[in-house]
């Protein structure tokens, strides 16, 4: 059985045996809330208000209109649009001044004890907030990124504090003095949406700009997949998927002429992005579609199974309403087949907010449904991966407005021991992708890094696309510590390397030639795996890679000038 009884940690209830449901809750009356569901509990599957009711969190709560949360490592990160709902006063005599929230709230992932609360992410010179919360992604053991209405911010974990904003992600329209009451102002433009961490990069949607590719080592944008997109996920095979607006006449918010309704958005295409080359493939949606999520931003329903190569999403064909979404679809990636697997309209119930998520352990779908905005009746559906309803759970009556399901992360990655390596004649490449797996996360998203090298004079070690390249530099031995980080939980393995060669070939090297053809940059004359840096004409680094003889660079836009640097030389190319 997947769900068992809760247990205590030093006298505290722990939340590892069920599913979190993050609620916007009743805007204008109180801050957002977090409930916990144990579907197999014999009498009461719901535990309510687990943040506010935690004795360790006296006087603290989530912010107003929370839309996103994620477990990363030992912490749960919850992002709200505002820090405080002016109507929050849950007890007689209690006011908003006595229960403080935050746009960023960090809790212990097991006990829900608040560890940090950040009310303002960025302020203008008057102290007015100019960055409302949107999303979060864990980057490594030291930091995460926070998506907002005004850029992507770097969140340090020790201590929990904002240390900067990623250049090129800002919203130049926001000053703190604008009026957004009409629903089409600066707050609703240039927003950051969903973000994902892959093995080598961070992908983030910026409204109407495209998918930004960020180097997590430098915190800089290295590539942009241009376009008008909504919501994003990563599939079991490692590819990135976004919903694409196919109405080329309305590529900018509000996607129509009728205020903020977005009636001209046509999300009839998925775009697949290769996580390493950034090559794209447009996949027409023969059934269903992807609704835009920018007005009253939500995380969107598009999500991926960790058990099979499939995506799930809900879709509302009525472009004039966000509140009557009833159809649930499955996309089989391998067969490129779209199938409607459920329709809740027969019960006059509708998916709310992000609507659905897939449990990583048993592949069951969790759906949040309601009647409409003025009725306090809600249901949590537990479904199999073919859309068959297994269980209906009904919480107490309240204006919950559920935003997102969040699953505990109970397992660290399982990593094989690494056998010793002897370098006899040149570089050796080792596939690390097959060395690690994680029961409750995507294997394709496990980040591999070289944490230490006991003798850098003997061997140079680099990891890219799950592959470790060992380049001998001198005769000798070295111990490498390779870290496998899966969603903030990590395992280290030691690799012993013995080099019997200097790695220097004494034959005359062929002349190097660089040229572009068929959307690829080719380099002829490489004698060994070579570290290649690619810059644009403004001096921005846009690619950092290791090429073996015969490899080429893909995914760079044509018609531009590039500068390549390798082997202490510089090459200029236009293709």
Question: Model segments located where?
Answer:
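Repeated scaffold domains used in trafficking and secretory/extracellular systems
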Residues: 59-68, 123-141, 172-197, 226-237, ...
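Loop/turn-rich, solvent-exposed surfaces of beta-rich toroidal or solenoidal domains
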Residues: 293-373
């Amino acid at each position: 059985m997947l769900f068992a009884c809760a247990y205590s940690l030093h006298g505290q209830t722990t939340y590892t045996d069920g599913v979190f449901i993050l609620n916007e809750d009743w805007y204008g009356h109180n801050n957002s809330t977090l409930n916990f569901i144990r579907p197999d509990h014999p009498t009461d599957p719901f535990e309510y208000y687990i943040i506010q009711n935690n004795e360790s969190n006296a006087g603290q709560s989530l912010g107003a209109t929370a839309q996103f949360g994620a477990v990363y490592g030992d912490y749960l990160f919850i992002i709200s649009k505002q820090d405080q709902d002016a109507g929050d006063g849950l007890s007689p005599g209690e006011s908003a001044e006595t229960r403080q929230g935050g746009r960023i709230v960090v809790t212990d992932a097991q006990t829900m004890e608040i560890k940090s609360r950040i009310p303002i992410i960025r302020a203008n010179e008057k102290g007015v907030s100019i960055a409302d919360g949107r999303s979060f992604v864990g980057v490594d053991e030291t930091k995460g990124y926070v998506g907002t209405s005004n850029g992507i911010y770097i969140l340090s974990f020790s201590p929990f504090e904002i240390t900067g904003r990623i250049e090129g992600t800002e919203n130049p329209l926001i000053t703190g003095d604008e009026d957004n009451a009409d629903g089409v102002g600066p707050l609703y433009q240039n927003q950051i949406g969903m973000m994902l961490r892959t093995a080598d990069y961070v992908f983030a949607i910026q409204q109407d700009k495209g998918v930004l590719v960020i180097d997590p080592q430098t915190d800089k944008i290295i590539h942009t997949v241009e376009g008008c997109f909504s919501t994003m996920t990563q599939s079991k095979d490692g590819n990135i998927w976004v919903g694409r607006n196919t109405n080329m006449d309305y590529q900018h918010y509000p996607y129509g002429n009728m205020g903020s309704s977005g009636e001209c958005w046509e999300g009839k295409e998925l775009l697949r992005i290769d996580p390493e080359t950034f090559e794209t493939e447009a996949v027409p949606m023969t059934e269903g579609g992807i609704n835009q999520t920018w007005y009253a931003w939500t995380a969107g329903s598009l999500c991926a199974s960790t058990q099979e190569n499939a995506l799930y999403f809900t879709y509302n064909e009525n472009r004039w309403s966000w509140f009557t979404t009833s159809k649930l679809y499955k996309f089989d990636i391998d067969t490129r087949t779209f199938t409607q697997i459920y329709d809740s309209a027969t019960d006059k119930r509708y998916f709310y907010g992000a609507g659905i998520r897939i449990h990583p352990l048993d592949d069951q779908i969790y759906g949040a449904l309601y009647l409409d905005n003025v009725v306090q009746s809600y249901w949590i559906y537990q479904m199999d991966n073919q859309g068959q309803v297994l269980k209906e759970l009904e919480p107490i009556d309240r204006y919950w407005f559920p935003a997102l399901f969040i699953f505990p992360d109970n397992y660290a990655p399982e990593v094989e021991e690494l056998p010793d390596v002897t370098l006899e004649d040149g570089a050796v490449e080792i596939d690390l992708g097959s060395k690690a797996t994680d029961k409750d996360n995507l294997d394709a998203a496990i980040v591999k890094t070289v944490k230490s090298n006991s003798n850098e004079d003997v061997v140079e070690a680099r990891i890219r696309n799950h592959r470790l390249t060992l380049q001998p530099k001198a005769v000798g031995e070295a111990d490498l510590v390779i870290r496998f980080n899966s969603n903030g939980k990590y395992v280290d393995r030691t690799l012993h390397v013995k080099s019997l060669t200097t790695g220097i070939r004494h034959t005359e090297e062929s002349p190097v030639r660089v040229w572009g053809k068929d959307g690829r940059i080719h380099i002829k004359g490489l004698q060994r795996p070579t570290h290649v840096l690619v810059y644009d004409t403004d001096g921005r680094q846009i690619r950092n890679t290791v090429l073996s003889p015969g490899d080429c660079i893909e995914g760079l836009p044509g018609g531009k000038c590039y500068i390549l640097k390798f082997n202490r030389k510089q090459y200029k190319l236009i293709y």
